[in-house]
Each structure stands twice: as structure tokens, then as C-alpha cells.
UniProtKB/Swiss-Prot annotation:
GO cellular component, one term: mitochondrion
Keywords (A to Z) from UniProt: Mitochondrion
Locations listed in the record: Mitochondrion
Protein name stated in the entry: Uncharacterized mitochondrial protein ymf26
Organism name: Marchantia polymorpha
Amino acid sequence: MDENRQVRFFQPFKKMFQTSQTSSVTGWIGSCVGGTSVSLLRLDGPKRPCVYPSIFIAVWKTK
């Protein structure tokens, strides 16, 4: 994925974080982590809408 596409791809997530309070975002991510890891381990597909954003955030933070 080239740089420009990546920036456009993450733009909505960045906006989401800037417009929402840190505590609520942290709580949202925290509440999703359990379900996300279970879904990934079982490999039966995501069961919650927050699975993908959680993965994106994890990848984004490591860059």
C-alpha cells in the first residue's frame, strides 16, 4: 500500500479520534479487545463491528 493511499485510508479513523474524547475511545477499544482476539483465534470471522478498527489502530500505532 503506497503512502498516499494509506493516509486516505486512515483519515476517517484519525478524525474519529480527534472528535471523540480519549477516555471514551480507550473504553471502546478496551471493550472490543476481548471479542476481537476470540474471533481471530476461532477464525470464524469478526463478530463485532469494532474488530477491524481495533486491528487498524494496532497497526497504525506500531508504524
